[in-house]
Amino acid sequence: MHPELLVRKRIWLMTLVLTGLFLLAAARIAVLTTSEAASLTERGIRQWTKAGIVTARRGTIIDRKGRTLAISATAYIVTADPRLVSDTERFLNSIEPVLNINKEAARKRLQDKTKGSIILKRQVSRETVDALRQLRSDAPEDSGLKALSFDEDICRYYPYGALLSQVLGLTTVDSEGQSGLESRYEDVLRGTEGSYLRQVDARNRQLDGTEGWYIPSQQGCGLVLTIDAEIQEMVEKAMRECIEVNQAQSVICLVSDVKTGAILAMCMNPCYDPNDPPRNDAETLTELMRLTAISDVYEPGSTFKILTAASALDSGVTTPQDSFYCSAKITVDGDTIRCWGRPHGAETMADGLKNSCNPVFVELALRMGTDTFYRYLTAFGLGKKTGIDLPGESPGILITSRNVKRVDLARIGFGQSVALTPIQMMMAANSVINGGKLMKPYIVSEIQTPDGETLERFHPTVMAAPIRPETSDTMRLLLERVVSEGGGKNAAIAGYRIGGKTGTAQVYKNGRVVRDTHIGSFYGFAPVNDPQVSILVIVKEADVPIDYGGTTAAPFARQIMQEMLPYLGIDPENDEKDEEIEVPALKGLTIGDAKRKLSQVGLESVTDGANTVVLDQLPPAGAKLVKGGHVMLYTAGSEEMTPEELVCVPNLTGLGDVDCARLVRQRGLTMSMTGQGLCTEQSPAAGEYVQPGTTIFLLMAGDDE
């Protein structure tokens, strides 16, 4: 081919190629500047800018005297740029000992190289961040630690630790209310988030001379509680001792202002530290966060007799001097209901309350009848929520009036066949002794701005007036006698007029009564002439030989009141300090010697009756009781028993399970029961001599109370 033609052909071909490339480039530019423009712009902005949320500080929660119970503190978010991490394992192994992260979850996030920043951990302390900064500064370039960056975050801090933990509640890592007041007042406590945008280099460092924008967050409003942190500390200290001494499954204690319904303390043990909750064990955390004082129901037992007595007096079916007779049992429509102990014989209504006599309260309930009794029970707030400002409240259980049987009514009279929450029991009992007003319990007294200005103030609310003031006056005196002469002696405090009532309730599991397992409780108030404060202590499933409320709950109510009353400025009415007696040391003594020693100083004893030597005592040596107070003597398992000594088997025929257990333990024997009700047969027979520790087999039939 002619050289000139060849050159022209090459020029033509080159022109076509260049034209094609130009057209392709133009088309690509057109695409980039039209359909892909937005996404490319966004990607570019992500590369040289960093945007984020400014977490709002939650409102502060303080007690009634201004002490901080919950506050938002500065923490940090630790992030990393996956694009700067070439060796993921080396990177994670370097930071894990300091940051304590979930390596598997972090590994997955770091594998996404399309993101410029991933969160490794939130709510990290300043100390940890400082350690990471030092680690990053000292690390070589190829370590990947230059990918780390830190931003301010907010965490919730509880200065008193586990104190009031269930009531205050918990927040999530995102600073959202999860339980307790944190959840109930989420809309009040949470603030308004802010945001920011800044220009950064490839290592997420802000570029000098560049501008961004920053919208600050707004702190949430705060809460002022009716809780007194100092009283709460008194209560929690006593409840820790209570659960340990009684080896109880759990304990609850409420303290309230009798006249207003304000809650001064609320303790539920076991508890947890909200600064370090077991977040990795959801089941355990859920159980620990439960507000059992308002959500769990229980048969109140004899503390309920406060309500029955008040109803009967107010309705006119009885008077304090009214005569009754207790033969240790009473039959209602063929159902035999037994008293808790030996027959009380002839007694007045006032004696019946002091003695906590079941037959007296059965008769009072039947005298009133369904319509009258239920009118009072409804006025006391039973069967409905109290309205306390906490989440998860239960209404309790009350058989409807149209479905209640006569025997049900009889049992309700002494605290069975009815279930209340602790807060219901306290508020109802308060109305009996505060002049007859059922108050709505409340725990938040004010909502405040972040600057401390009051936005809303909550006032005492009267929900009903169950009884007349005159009836309330009478009930206060009757309940004072329970503490001074009856089963509440262990709650007496020298110089103070204390009223109250003990209770021992059955425990149900799978719909059946659990043998030898009870809920002991004590409700008390002071001073009797002008009640200011009340207390309710509930001890669930104590693992001690005698688990009545008078021995498991009352001593700890006394311990709290003895410290709390002077703190509240409630002075003793007299200086009868000589009536306060120091409990002597009794361990190692025989039962006879221990009883004589107690009698000499003016104290009384209660024993499990198992053996002959005192192994332990409650209250311990050195504690103070008023004259006539009870000291528990524990003898179970004494090594002083002689194995060869024969024991005479007692006659148990016709006795109930409680009396059988008492007599059997007194002889150092054990027993096994079949059936429910009263003993109809036993083996070995009464009068036979057996070795200590022998099991007596009992056949029970008839009523099971």
Predicted segment positions?
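Periplasmic/cell-envelope proteins involved in peptidoglycan metabolism and beta-lactam response
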Residues: M1-P278, D371-G383, G392, A491-A494, ...
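Beta-lactam-recognizing serine transpeptidase/beta-lactamase-like catalytic domain environment
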Residues: H2, A70, D201-Y214, C253, ...
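Extracytoplasmic
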Residues: V54-R57, R64, S72-A75, K115, ...
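Soluble non-cytosolic domains of exported or imported proteins
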Residues: A56, P82-E89, R122-R126, S175-S179, ...
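Preference for bulky hydrophobic residues occupying beta-strand positions
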Residues: V78-A80, R122, D187, L225, ...
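Conserved NTP-handling cores and scaffolds of large molecular machines
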Residues: P82, L99, R136, T171, ...
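Generic structural signal for residues in well-ordered beta-strands
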Residues: L148-F150, C253, F324, I498, ...
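Ligand-recognition elements built from short beta-strands and adjacent flexible loops
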Residues: G495, K509, D516, V537-E705
